[in-house]
């Protein structure tokens, strides 16, 4: 039995089995152009592999205003949508969404694999949030968009220190 909490506030108790989820984070039109041209293709391949392995596929959208003032929450045109499990966030950490946490616990998810953008912000914050909630977390490095590679080296070290698995 795992008691999970968010910021020292007990949210619930959940019996967890060894179920897995793939979190696809921020693969949106407004973000994806900043990264390698084949990032969506690699993400799509991982989505299909995860679907075949019976992972629960979950999409995370950032709905906060961009620095430019623009709000854009449309997925990238060529992103494969393998499920209708979509959760919105207005903070870097996807686990700031109680709805996401409740959904994952209702599905008895214990392990989370993350792919998406950006490795130094939303992926990092979401990985830390997931660990705080008691999930086993892994990040698939070839499916992570990173705009500042030197900084990402430090990010990877920080994530490994808290138990995040880098694949």
What are these regions (language model features)?
Residues 2-91, 101-102, 106-107, 164-165:
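Active-site acidic carboxylates
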Residues 87-93, 142-145:
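Short beta->alpha junction loops
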Residues 96-97, 122-124:
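Short, well-ordered alpha-helical microsegments
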Residues 110:
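Short acidic/polar active-site loop segments enriched in Thr and Asp
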Residues 113-116, 135-149:
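A short glycine-rich beta-strand->turn/loop micro-motif centered on a GG-aromatic cluster
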Residues 123-133:
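Short Gly/Thr/Asp-enriched flexible loops that form oxyanion-binding sites at enzyme active sites
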Residues 148-161:
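Active-site-proximal loop->helix
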